[in-house]
Amino acid sequence: MGAARGSPARPRRLPLLSVLLLPLLGGTQTAIVFIKQPSSQDALQGRRALLRCEVEAPGPVHVYWLLDGAPVQDTERRFAQGSSLSFAAVDRLQDSGTFQCVARDDVTGEEARSANASFNIKWIEAGPVVLKHPASEAEIQPQTQVTLRCHIDGHPRPTYQWFRDGTPLSDGQSNHTVSSKERNLTLRPAGPEHSGLYSCCAHSAFGQACSSQNFTLSIADESFARVVLAPQDVVVARYEEAMFHCQFSAQPPPSLQWLFEDETPITNRSRPPHLRRATVFANGSLLLTQVRPRNAGIYRCIGQGQRGPPIILEATLHLAEIEDMPLFEPRVFTAGSEERVTCLPPKGLPEPSVWWEHAGVRLPTHGRVYQKGHELVLANIAESDAGVYTCHAANLAGQRRQDVNITVATVPSWLKKPQDSQLEEGKPGYLDCLTQATPKPTVVWYRNQMLISEDSRFEVFKNGTLRINSVEVYDGTWYRCMSSTPAGSIEAQARVQVLEKLKFTPPPQPQQCMEFDKEATVPCSATGREKPTIKWERADGSSLPEWVTDNAGTLHFARVTRDDAGNYTCIASNGPQGQIRAHVQLTVAVFITFKVEPERTTVYQGHTALLQCEAQGDPKPLIQWKGKDRILDPTKLGPRMHIFQNGSLVIHDVAPEDSGRYTCIAGNSCNIKHTEAPLYVVDKPVPEESEGPGSPPPYKMIQTIGLSVGAAVAYIIAVLGLMFYCKKRCKAKRLQKQPEGEEPEMECLNGGPLQNGQPSAEIQEEVALTSLGSGPAATNKRHSTSDKMHFPRSSLQPITTLGKSEFGEVFLAKAQGLEEGVAETLVLVKSLQSKDEQQQLDFRRELEMFGKLNHANVVRLLGLCREAEPHYMVLEYVDLGDLKQFLRISKSKDEKLKSQPLSTKQKVALCTQVALGMEHLSNNRFVHKDLAARNCLVSAQRQVKVSALGLSKDVYNSEYYHFRQAWVPLRWMSPEAILEGDFSTKSDVWAFGVLMWEVFTHGEMPHGGQADDEVLADLQAGKARLPQPEGCPSKLYRLMQRCWALSPKDRPSFSEIASALGDSTVDSKP
């Protein structure tokens, strides 16, 4: 340790015990370090908050939280996310106190605690207006002091405003005083003119609240009019009479006047035209006869005493009405159960009375089948209870009725069970499952315990029979049918044996080529119910030459001669099925070789370029040229280009746009070969007018330029060739898994399309990303997106950190001037803090993807900040945050937190929007790779947008699995994606099925009861299936199962998914 400042440096002696203990203490010092500690912060009552905590330790640690020293238990409102503590809605009572993050090493027992943190919670809460002085209302007398208190409280302290009969009371008036500190209103002295309804409101930085219960102050004065009898609302049928009663008292007696809505006075001498049948009696009552619709409205009775304000009493005259009743859905009940059917009364005035009838007889209020309130109750249901029941509703306006058809279900019984069957390959096959029941039973089929969904191969008839449209060998397995009604189900199974047809596997190609004077083989294989015998013979019946052997179906030529050409027949035969033949025409050819190949050529602009190419072979090859990714058609070349008979290409008057790679393609009926070379068009140097004796000759200058250009081009070609080779190997591996004719899937998050089957644009993209290009063209390509989307970093105002992704921090910010006419825009910002080259490349690919997509259900790229480190990607954000949190909140039991519950129709709408966004993404040949509820955003209008937050480092760390040196979303990944790294649109479809499951379970963790290793083992075994969520329609669960088909070919496209969900939206009930 250094000496203290200002004192001479001298050795410091330590006691021997201290010297011995220092190494020990150093060795036992805790290895747990807090990278980020929680800090005290402001919070709003009922809003979200996050206490961040990040630790670093050599081994696994257990992180938990304390509140005032007691462990914090996870709830729907307050729960751990990674090592941080998340609050879905801050509560001032439950969250007041000191929080502390604790990290414990369960192996060593070491423990570290963070600094204390707490919330400064801002809130406001409504309360009543109460009488403070005098002690009770009975003690209030004229000319006494009256004090009222407003029981609205909050933090910070709010300001108060008092009202009498809805009119604000200003401070400083002589007849009352207001004390904001005490929240009091004092009336001194109080008189009859102070009578009225007193209320208060309070304002603070958190918001506004008004009194939950108001105070009515009534100070009597004999000269003031007082209510004796107030008019009541009246409902009458058309053309009937209506009577309103109204009386006041005062000394001296008060005056009384009636007004209709338009403020027209009603008297016996002067009646308005629309109230000619109105009569006012001496006691103040108003009679209306033969009421019509124009008489309906508000009637006011006004009493005025000698002193005091007038008293206005209102009553409304309604005409009786009744609406139609909603339709009943047919009901199916099971025998022996108890069921209820509710009849909701139609809207009407007065409220209609409701009763049930069956077979024209009104149901009693007790018994086995009876009416209770508005409900039809059927106890211990019998089959005889089936039939039509009628609900009646009636009031003064008339009567309505609606029927409900009740069916009593029975358990299905067998008419014909499925039988073990032998089905012929290639022909239709049928399995019967005939049952009867009430109502008509539903039949489903299972193949190897997997539900059979109808597609091009399977069809289930209305009677339950299963048709296999074209039986294949692998259809030989167990089949099970289940017939069910609400009363129960029955099932049976049968074994299918496929009678394999005699066939070639695969059929030999009808035309094949063999290279002259080389060894060659022509295979022929076949299968059948019995192993077939395979032999070859010449089509003319002649025997095979001695140098040609037939070995178990393989025709082997030791050395191909011209005489070996001709027609051959492969014959496969067995006893039960006879024989089949395949004819093959063999051609002997000399395979193509290039006598002259085109070379790299540099030509001055305006001169003539010659690219030589000559090929030989038998049959004689035809030569074509491809330039700049298009075939050069000799009939459309124009006057500048010409292809000679020997295959050479000449270009006259070359221009800069002629620069590029030219490919010479030689082909005949047996094979195709190609070779290519670059053409460079350069400007001719202008000679100086006077050259000194030391100036180099012109040919020397050209030689220097040629060498420089040649060296640069050679370097670029070498690097591009290496990249092309690596990518071609990767693509070839993926293409092997795809059916013939299907275009290979594009690289994940890469926008470059395939050109003529070659990934040329993709190579160019890689060049831009890895800075291989050094010229202006490469620089312009690399910065095209960033220049167009540049946004100044100084215009971003960070709000809060959402979490950490593989790239770096993800946070919310306000962007100033981002959109025209909008001062500030709420945006999501992803930062690139990683120095890993692969992650930098992924970051670039992600911004390219969002920059190119334009769809209402995909977030937009709004800007880029790349003028300094770290780089920022500015993305669109919507107000409710990610879909995962939205789903979890929707099922919360906390009344302060819970939003409106989601109906099935709304859940389907959420899934449909994600499917439409992914359809747009896949149509543009992008692959997401991390589709999940956590990576979708949702607005208050429940609009969903596909995004890529990727908070794998903290908030959603538990949803990622460390596999092969990377963090992957294991529980959302298809088998081929996790086991082979084969990501495609079909692996995104698998993840979409899991997202649908998340929506219908309100954000539960997929495979929540299993450890990550168990989920991985199930994926490897092909058994990873999620159960049907509670309340999820079977039709939608079948769609999920289609998304989880083991073969990517059997999974639907996003267009099919969007269409199926659109149909389900129509069918779904709230």
Swiss-Prot record:
Q: Name one GO biological process term.
A: axis elongation
Alphabetical list of Pfam families matching this protein? I-set, Ig_3, PK_Tyr_Ser-Thr
Q: Where is this site: Cleavage?
A: P621, L622
The recorded induction information for this protein reads:
Higher expression in cell lines established from normal non-tumorigenic tissues compared to cell lines established from highly metastatic invasive carcinomas (at protein level).
Tell me which residues make up the Ig-like C2-type domain: 31-120, 128-218, 225-317, 309-407, 412-497, 503-586, 578-680
Tissues in which the protein is found: Highly expressed in lung, liver, pancreas, kidney, placenta and melanocytes. Weakly expressed in thyroid gland, ovary, brain, heart and skeletal muscle. Also expressed in erythroleukemia cells. But not expressed in colon.
Q: Which domain of life is it from?
A: Eukaryota
User: What is its membrane topology?
Assistant: Single-pass type I membrane protein
A GO molecular function term, named singly, is: axon guidance receptor activity
Which keywords does this chain's UniProt record carry?
Cell adhesion, Cell junction, Disulfide bond, Glycoprotein, Immunoglobulin domain, Membrane, Phosphoprotein, Receptor, Repeat, Signal, Transmembrane, Transmembrane helix, Wnt signaling pathway
Q: What does UniProt say on post-translational modification here?
A: MMP14 cleaves PTK7 between Pro-621 and Leu-622 generating an N-terminal soluble (70 kDa) fragment and a membrane C-terminal (50 kDa) fragment. Proteolysis by MMP14 regulates PTK7 function in non-canonical Wnt signaling pathway.
Q: Where in the cell is it found?
A: Membrane; Cell junction
Residues where Phosphoserine occurs?
A: S1064
Q: What is the effect of changing A933V?
A: In a colorectal adenocarcinoma sample; somatic mutation
Give the glycosylated residues.
N116, N175, N184, N214, N268, N283, N405, N463, N567, N646
Q: Which InterPro entries match?
A: Cell_Adh-Cytoskel_Orgn, Ig-like_dom, Ig-like_dom_sf, Ig-like_fold, Ig_I-set, Ig_sub, Ig_sub2, Kinase-like_dom_sf
Membrane spanning stretches = 705-725
What cellular component GO annotations does this protein have? axon; cell-cell junction; cytosol; focal adhesion; intracellular membrane-bounded organelle; neuronal cell body; plasma membrane
- Major localization listed first in the record, in broad terms: membrane
Question: Which sequence ranges are listed under topological domain Cytoplasmic?
Answer: 726-1070
Query: Which portions of the sequence form the region Disordered?
Result: 736-759, 773-793
Tell me the domain comment. The protein kinase domain is predicted to be catalytically inactive.
What quaternary structure, including any partners, is listed in this protein's UniProt entry? Interacts with CTNNB1.
Q: In UniProt terms, what function does this protein have?
A: Inactive tyrosine kinase involved in Wnt signaling pathway. Component of both the non-canonical (also known as the Wnt/planar cell polarity signaling) and the canonical Wnt signaling pathway. Functions in cell adhesion, cell migration, cell polarity, proliferation, actin cytoskeleton reorganization and apoptosis. Has a role in embryogenesis, epithelial tissue organization and angiogenesis.
Which family does this protein fall into? Answer: Belongs to the protein kinase superfamily. Tyr protein kinase family. Insulin receptor subfamily.
**Name under which the protein is recorded:** Inactive tyrosine-protein kinase 7
Q: Which organism is it from?
A: Homo sapiens
Encoding gene (name): PTK7
